[in-house]
Amino acid sequence: MPRQRAPKEEEAELLTKQERSARSSEDASDTSISSISTTSLVLEHINDPAINGTSRSRRGEKYTDEDDEAQEAFDVEGGRYKSPISVDKKTRRWLWIVGIACVTGWALALVFFLMSGSYKHVSTRPHDPLASSTKGSGKKITMDDVFGGRFYAREQSLKWIAGPNGEDGLLLERDAGNAEYLVVEDIRNKGDGDSSAKKTKLMQKSGFNVNGYFVRPVEVWPSKDFKKTGEPLDPENQDGRVQLASLSPQSDAVVFTRNNNMYLRKLDSKEVIQITRDGGSELFYGIPDWVYEEEVFQTNSATWWSEDGKYIAFLRTDESTVPTYPVQYFVSRPSGDKPKAGEENYPEVRNIKYPKAGAPNPIVTLQFYDVEKAEVFSVEIEDDFRDNNRLITEIVWAGKTKQVLVRETNRESDILKVVLMDVEKRTGKTVRTENVAELDGGWFEVSQKTTFVPADPANGRKDDGYIDTIIHEGYDHIGYFTPLDNDKPIVLSQGEWEVVDAPSRVDLKNNIVYYISTAKSSMERHAYSVFLNGTGTSEVVENSGSGYYGASFSAGGSYALITYQGPGIPWQKIISTPSSKDKFEKVLEENKALDRFVREREMPILNYQTIEVDGFKLNVLERRPPHFNEKKKYPVLFYQYSGPGSQEVNKKFHVDFQAYIAANLEYIVVTVDGRGTGFLGRKLRCITRGNIGYYEAHDQIAAAKIWASKKYVDADRLAIWGWSYGGFNTLKTLEQDAGQTFKYGMAVAPVTDWRYYDSIYTERYMHTPQNNAAGYNNSTITDVASLAKNTRFLLMHGVADDNVHMQNTLTLLDRLDLAGVENYDVHVFPDSDHSIYFHNANRIVYDKLRWWLINAFNGEWAKIKTAEPKAQVDARMERR
């Protein structure tokens, strides 16, 4: 289930002493004496009216330069001018004595302050390196700032590739500037004065003319020798629509899909060879159907070349038994087809093969094509899953061995099989089976990070093997399986933390594995390396401090593109890895313009913390208004997503709608990653299985009660909102809470009944409805009487949502109608899908959320409960 589309997502020490931190100590200050250094206290308050004798303006009054009569005597620039008074020697001597005594006293006080424990290091403060705490320190964040991309961090579009002769450190750079669209460059030359001459230019411009048409590439693949020239893929059908194209590893052939059939073009010939012939509207070759693209591959490719280019693996997808869901378009015609005469005023209907929970799934089988023999074949497995109980989630060629690893699960995603096939012998066997239903009652997430490790006896690797994610003592880690049919791994990482999309790269020369993990904090990401024997774990970036880092590694593992994503201003640099002989470091992006823009804005204070609910520690992010005052009472908005394995509380730099609410409207915004979310271990994650919505809602309510008890929170003004799964959990929370804690809620594109959502996602967490009818009933939003006990809630949905169908909101509205519940508002968006973008809709969503929330916290929705005509109110007042 994808999240809503919001402003791009997606504060710590920098990696080198030469680089400045994103926010210096002069920029971040607290009003609490116990949480700042005495030095900053003195410097900050030199001009404080309470110290120098001037009077403060009363709370609520705007700052003005026109001070009263009593103030003028103390002002030099703004007050009445008075001639300076001369000071004699005796007076100056006494001033020196008093000054020295003051400095001595201050020094003694500082020593006492530090020794007494009153001083708190910066790490103990709320994590707010970019926050504004000085009144009038900047401009307010606006909606135009957020949605206009002004807080977007620049990232250079780079991709590591291997050189023709195995060179390491080559970058494929897209849109590189200097009128060059696509270039290959050695990173060691990047930025040099004469680097332009050392670049290999693959494409000068971003497009070109073909037979009178201007063509722009959607994707590019460099040939192995960087010397291929552009020409039509199919000379006989140059204008034909191509659904997918894939270049062979040797850059000598292209396999492509057209009209759901597969074709092969060998580049030394103009001939196009048709591989399959029975593809059609319900049978696909080499590309996934809707549910596999959405929930498994998240791409339109289901085609895999062998490393030697002699075989092609591909999926055959038969969705003939999958039921159809109609999506209606009332304003536009996405197909581009002209309506038939007389049907101009009817909506266009797009019929999607959409398997809902419990419905028939597409039948997916793995097939192979022998390029030399021009033959399609399959490999039979003795103990394979039945066709209607099999999900194929990953294909990995085992180097040049003509073997392939296939990852499969059962329909409910709790039994995993790793199958090893030999395409030359056309045999296969299951080499590894895991059952997490028996282990911890959980599930397997879809993953495509399995990495083949070839044998190299001279380098200590006797047999071929592969690296895969494993479950080790309740956490996701990485293991090395060797030989290929071994089901017992060498454990490469371990601890009460988890790896993330690992491994990132394997350095075969030095037997080093690189990966990203949450070892320092579940809210952070850092890069690590470990040897293939499981020893020598070390951090790739020394002294990285607190932060959220991404890393991509060169083909040979000698270089890494490090992307610091927050919480401070993001930056990018390329460094040499510890295994590299030559030390190298080059800053690519510092986002100086963004840094200046942020410093001119009043930013929210970010307070990262954990709370305990039912013995589980949950991550929380509290966003406070820039000039937070504990003596005030603030309304609180809870924003969450809460989906299985997701994470919202992380230390990325992210100025979004929530930041706007906190910084501009001056509401507190809290995000809680409750049970079921990711990166805190399987015990916390898998407890929700079979009953999603219960623990997620329970934890939001528990957190809300904690905040409601805080002195600075107005307990009568608590609201919650979310999109997609977050919309579902918003409604589930309001249903479970029944107005006791939360008074308001806003749900966008929510699931209201999991029987309406797609099979692969839903059954992973809920089993099938046939096997868990009670769980589905519990997870459905049905208790409308409890929803009626909330002050008010808001529903929004895109009419053309092909992901979370409008059916979800409409069936809930019907339940509300039947029960006579009316304390809600509804807004639907014609022709908008799950992201709600059509015809300015996305901005309208957030404008609606903003104004609706303001009215809620202003008490307007409470008045509606007893609304009556103004004339009647006036008449009643007159009678009194």
Swiss-Prot record:
Biased amino acid composition, Basic and acidic residues: 1-26
Annotated keywords: Aminopeptidase, Glycoprotein, Hydrolase, Membrane, Protease, Serine protease, Signal-anchor, Transmembrane, Transmembrane helix, Vacuole
Active site, per annotation: S724, D801, H834
Pfam families noted in UniProt: DPPIV_N, Peptidase_S9
Side Vacuolar, residues: 115-880
Subcellular location: Vacuole membrane
Ranges of the Cytoplasmic topological domain: 1-93
Segments passing through the bilayer: 94-114
GO biological process, alphabetically ordered: proteolysis
Record function comment: Type IV dipeptidyl-peptidase which removes N-terminal dipeptides sequentially from polypeptides having unsubstituted N-termini provided that the penultimate residue is proline.
Protein name in UniProt: Probable dipeptidyl-aminopeptidase B
Species of origin: Pyrenophora tritici-repentis (strain Pt-1C-BFP) (Wheat tan spot fungus)
